[in-house]
């Protein structure tokens, strides 16, 4: 079936309707909520895992080679291959996608934290703490972690739009969220045959993703600057 002229965006249907006559605004609204919820869960999950691994990776010299090799092993395989294998072997659902993204997405945060830890690891106060026998967890959480808060916040803010874009791409390709879960990628996949005749079917979801990306980037920079101890000296 095709979309008739009365189904174009109007006062009753703000985003028009799809090829089946369903309100496109409602679909995009619910799909956006699902995508944001997924992105927040993934951002928090991969940040917690990445920060813990990154702190240990950067501070404990004996484990540096192990984590470096693990990073290279995982990072050298394209992300989409992991997600395709997971979708085929494990299945497709909100929970599976969230866990999968966290299991792979911690790499970027861990690498960033590890590089920052290198800058503070051999400072005088950390050397003194080691000489005094201060527990490892206390050195990491009290002497190093406060200086990384701004980097962590910024990375989390950038992770949210990146996750939304990735989820949309995977769902559009059929290897993302299941068909029972509304998502931006799934919506675009269903109406892709009508993009040329009715470009609003593509423009509206793409605009939503762009607004979300810009908003979280601006907020992330603002919170990052506010949390940076160097800005309060």
Question: Predicted regions span which residues?
Answer:
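Transmembrane alpha-helices and adjacent helix-loop boundaries
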Residues: 48-52, 60, 76-82, 93-94, ...
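Short, small-residue-biased leader/transition segments that mark boundaries at the very start
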Residues: 1-5
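Amphipathic cytosolic juxtamembrane alpha-helices at the membrane-cytosol interface
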Residues: 22-37, 62-64, 68, 121-122, ...
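Generic hydrophobic transmembrane alpha-helix motif, especially the helices
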Residues: 14, 18, 58-59, 63-120
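C-terminal transmembrane helix and the adjacent membrane-cytosol boundary/short C-terminal tail
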Residues: 61, 94, 103-104, 150, ...
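Transmembrane alpha-helix signature in integral membrane proteins
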Residues: 24-59, 212
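Glycine-rich helix-loop "coupling/hinge" segments at transmembrane-helix boundaries
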Residues: 87-90, 117, 165-208
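Membrane-cytosol interface at the C-terminal ends of specific transmembrane alpha-helices
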Residues: 42-43, 51, 88, 92-142, ...
């Amino acid at each position: 079936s095709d979309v008739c002229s009365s189904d174009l965006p109007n006062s009753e249907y703000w985003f028009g309707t799809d090829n089946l006559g369903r309100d496109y605004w409602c679909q995009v609204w619910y799909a956006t909520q699902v995508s944001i919820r997924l992105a927040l869960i993934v951002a928090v999950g991969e940040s917690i895992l990445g920060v813990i691994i990154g702190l240990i990776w950067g501070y404990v010299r004996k484990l540096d080679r192990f984590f470096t090799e693990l990073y290279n092993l995982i990072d050298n395989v394209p992300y989409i291959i992991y997600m395709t294998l997971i979708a085929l072997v494990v299945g497709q659902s909100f929970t599976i996608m969230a866990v999968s993204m966290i299991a792979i997405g911690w790499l970027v945060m861990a690498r960033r934290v590890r590089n920052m830890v290198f800058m503070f690891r051999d400072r005088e106060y950390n050397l003194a703490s080691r000489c005094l026998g201060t527990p490892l967890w206390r050195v990491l959480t009290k002497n190093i972690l406060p200086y990384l808060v701004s980097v962590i916040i910024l990375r989390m803010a950038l992770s949210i739009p990146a996750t939304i874009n990735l989820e949309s791409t995977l769902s559009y390709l059929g290897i993302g969220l299941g068909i029972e879960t509304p998502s931006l990628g799934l919506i675009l996949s269903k109406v892709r045959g009508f993009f040329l005749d009715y470009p609003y079917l593509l423009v509206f979801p793409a605009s939503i993703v762009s607004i979300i990306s810009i908003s979280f980037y601006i907020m992330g920079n603002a919170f990052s600057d506010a949390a940076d101890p160097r800005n309060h000296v």
